[in-house]
Each structure stands twice: as C-alpha cells, then as structure tokens.
Curated annotation (Swiss-Prot), chain B:
Record-given protein name: Urease accessory protein UreG
Alphabetic keyword roster: Chaperone, Cytoplasm, GTP-binding, Nickel insertion, Nucleotide-binding
Species this protein is from: Parafrankia sp. (strain EAN1pec)
Originating gene: ureG
Residues engaged in binding GTP: 48-55
Compositionally biased intervals (Gly residues): 9-22
Length: 231, 245
C-alpha cells in the first residue's frame, strides 16, 4: 500500500551531534586556532568555519558521496570491495598532507564505524577508514543517498568545530547556533557540489580543497603541551 | 568490544526521595553487578570529583596489583595527558600499559555518553599487549553526577574525599548512590577539616540502600600506599581463574 518513502530519519540520526561517534573530542583545528589567537569570538569563528567548509568540508563531502555511490552501485554487499575502498583511502591520504589530520580522520572513522555497526548492517572492515569514507559506507548502509552522505559530511565539518569553540571560549551557544544557521545555505551548496562531483568524476579527480593553515594548526596541536581536544 | 550491558546504574528504577531533607538521588532496589567476563579483561571504572584522589588510587592499585595480575590503565584527562604522565613517572606500571584518551573538555561525555574512544583504547591495550586480567579506566575529574556507562566498564568505583566535607554522601547522586564501590578517601584529613566519618558512613549506606553488594570503603593512601581494602575488592571482582592465590 505504501510507496517508496525516502530515508530521512536515518540522516538526522547520522548527523546528530549526540551520535556517540567520537566527534566530541575533536575540534577540527579550533583549539589550536584559539590558542594562537586567530579565533577570539563569533566573527572569527564564522570566518574559520566558512574556510573549513569550503576546503576540507568540500573534500570530505565529495568523498562521502562518492563512497556512498560506489557502495550503493555495488549492491547490498556485506563485505565491501577492498580494492575499491583502498583507492578512495589513498586519494584522501594524498589530499591530507598533515599526519595529525590523517590520524584524527582515521580515529573518527573508527569510532563512527563502531557505532554504525550497532545501528546498521555495516561490515567489520575496514576497521579505521578515513572519516569521510566511513560516512559514505555508513550512509549507504542506512539507506541514504550520496547527497545525504555529502550533507552529513559538510554539516560535520562545521558543526563539531563550532561546538568546540563554545567550550573553549565560553561563547554564547545560542549565538553560535545563529552563526551555523547563517552558513547553512553554504553547507547545502557545498553538499550539492560534492554530490555532483561524485557522480561525474573518478576518485582521483574529486575535489582536493586544501587549507595549509588547517594543516599547520593540526600539526601544532599534536605537539602542544596542554590539549583538551584530540585534534 | 562494546559490552552491551543492559544494566542501569544503581540497578534501575526511578530516583527515590528521602523524607524531610528534600529529594535525593538514592539507590533504588535493583540487580547486582553482572558476571565478570571470561573472554577479555575485567574493566573497572574509577570516577569521582576533581581532587578526590582518583589518580592516586589508581597508582596505589597498580602498586598493589601489577606484580600479581596482568594489568592495563586508560586515563581520561580533562586536558593533555597529565594523569597518564603522573602514572608513568610514579613508576608503578610499565608505561606501555597506560593509554590516555582526550575528552574535548567533557570527561563525563567520554565515559558515559560517547564511549567510543575509550572502547578503542581498552581494546587496543589487549590487542597490543595480549590478554589482560584487569583494565582500570580512570575518568577525568568531574562532579557528583559523572558516572560510567556499563557499555564501557563492568564495575565502577566512585571516589570522594573527606576534605570536600562530610555532607557529600548525603548529597547522593548517581556516583555516590549507584557505584559498585564507594571509596571515601583522605580519611587522615578528617580531624583537620572537621569531617565526621561516622556521619559519612551512615549517609553513604543510606544512599546506597544499605546493600551488602554495594560496599563503602574508607581509605588513607598516606598510611596505606597500596589501598589494600580496595585492591582486595577489585581482586574479588575478577573471575576466579584470574584471581591470584
């Protein structure tokens, strides 16, 4: 009697900041930026988030969408083709020059895969893929579309760092929500661009947005004497 | 491995109110702790407010147990790796047996709401070191409501100290009321801060429903560097094949 109902609730679950997927311990460079004085308040934070979204956000969203598309095309496999995933992993590695960022991405990929295995039919391997690769795998397992995976990745690229800024600077959380709402349309745009790219391009030609300042912040953070966030 | 315990803190049920003094979070009647695991290390959480002596207690337990059972420690610092560094420098345990988890300003989140990074850490300890008997998971200093998820640990110890005042047990909360073992630390300071240990013992027992399976121990690590009563309790939690003779 019922027609096809598009999966929406699963997307909300996947993008929920309270999803126990390990993200709460990562600031995405915000802690290092607070320490070096480049984020001191709401305006700085908004600019930081816009820059992050346009670079590493686009990259993550493109790979999440591409992996989701690849898994969906391959059918409801319980074990993903290792060679296909290895290509995506290598491409993300090549786009992530900071070892600290690669480690943070894989740590979050591992924790996301853990919670996803409790929620959906997600295979045991890969155990610790890049976070954006994990998002693509999980989105497909949750019955979501590539554009949903892209949106979740783009959202995560700003939402977690914004929360970290609230904790680190004592910013007004309501005002920070206002900032996130301001850039929500950009999140949608980035997700749409990522989805389109994932449909048209091979893995090696997916967006390679780069933010040298984020790389430097990540590297500096790993050697900081005092550190509250993992990244 | 996620423990998938279906065991609420304090054994389930709604918070109860005590007469007269307003509502308190008391221990409801419930089920005893589940059986100790036999296919991996027993995981024991050590939580409690800032400064109550969690790290010192973990160091004491290492001192007492490291030579007797296969032991690992995971720390959850508020920031950086202060507690892990302290344990390493105290020389009570091989540094390779200590892992630090960073908690993003939210120690309670890492032990209760999002335990994934801690699960990674406890699993990594056993995959790197081989089979262990016991892993102590020390929380970052938080407050009276910060307790462990039973998806992460099998047992939890909540540590308070007399210097916070003898009213602390009366305040209750999930840690005081529902932990498997309540430790009241720094008893040597009681005369200096005017804390009445008998009052603390009475209030703690009341908050914990007077249950024999949920004991309260009083410790002074200054006079007992191996926290022998706590160490004995921990050993008694191990499955019998893992218990040293």
């Amino acid at each position: 009697m019922t027609g096809h109902v598009e999966a929406r609730a699963a997307l909300l679950l996947l993008a929920d900041g309270r999803l126990p997927a390990g993200g709460h311990a990562h600031s995405g460079g915000v802690e290092a930026a607070v320490l070096d004085g480049s984020i001191t308040g709401l305006r700085d934070l908004a600019e930081f988030l816009r820059g992050r979204l346009a670079t590493s956000g686009l990259l993550a969203a493109s790979f999440a969408a591409a992996v989701c598309r690849s898994v969906r095309t391959a059918g409801p496999a319980t074990e993903l083709a290792a060679d296909v995933l290895a290509v995506f992993e290598a491409e993300v590695d090549a786009r992530t020059p900071s070892p600290a960022q690669r480690a943070a991405s894989r740590a979050q990929g591992r924790t996301l895969m853990r919670v996803a295995r409790a929620a959906w039919a997600v295979p045991a391997h890969p155990a610790a893929p890049h976070h954006c690769v994990a998002l693509g795998i999980v989105a497909a397992a949750a019955g979501l579309e590539p554009r949903d995976a892209a949106l979740a990745a783009a959202h995560a690229s700003v939402n977690g760092p914004a929360t970290a800024a609230v904790r680190l600077l004592g910013l007004d959380p309501l005002a920070v929500t206002g900032v996130l709402a301001e850039i929500a349309a950009e999140v949608d745009r980035i997700a749409a661009a990522a989805d389109t790219a994932s449909a048209l391009r091979a893995p090696e030609r997916l967006p390679a947005g780069s933010a040298p300042q984020l790389d430097l912040l990540a590297e500096r953070h790993r050697t900081a004497e005092v550190r509250m966030f993992t990244s | 491995m996620h423990l998938e315990h279906d065991r609420p803190l304090g054994g389930g049920g709604a918070p109860a109110a005590s007469g007269g003094a307003g509502p308190r979070w008391q221990s409801p009647p419930g089920t005893p702790a589940g059986p100790a695991p036999t296919d991996r290390a027993l995981r024991v959480g050590v939580g409690g407010p800032v400064g109550s002596g969690k790290t010192a207690l973990v160091a004491a337990l290492c001192r007492a147990l490291a030579g007797r059972i296969r032991l690992g420690v995971v720390t959850n610092d508020i920031y950086t790796t202060e507690d892990a560094d302290f344990l390493r420098s105290a020389g009570v345990l091989d540094p390779g047996r200590i892992r630090a988890v960073e908690t993003g300003c939210c120690p309670h989140t890492a032990i209760r709401d999002d335990i994934t990074a801690n699960l990674d850490a406890v699993e990594d300890l056993e995959s790197d070191l081989g089979r262990l008997d016991l892993i102590l998971v020390e929380s970052g200093g938080d407050n009276l409501t910060a307790t462990f998820s039973y998806g992460l640990v099998d047992r939890q110890i909540f540590v308070i100290d007399v210097a916070g005042g003898d009213k602390v047990p009366r305040k209750g909360g999930p840690g005081v009321a529902g932990s498997d073992l309540l430790v009241v630390n720094k008893t040597d300071l009681a005369p200096l801060v005017g804390a009445d240990l008998a009052v603390m013992a009475r209030d703690a027992a009341a908050m914990r429903g007077g249950r024999a399976d949920r004991p309260v121990l009083f410790t002074s690590l200054r006079s007992d560097a191996g926290a022998s009563d706590v160490a004995d309790w921990v050993l008694a939690q191990l499955p019998s094949p893992a218990r040293p003779q």
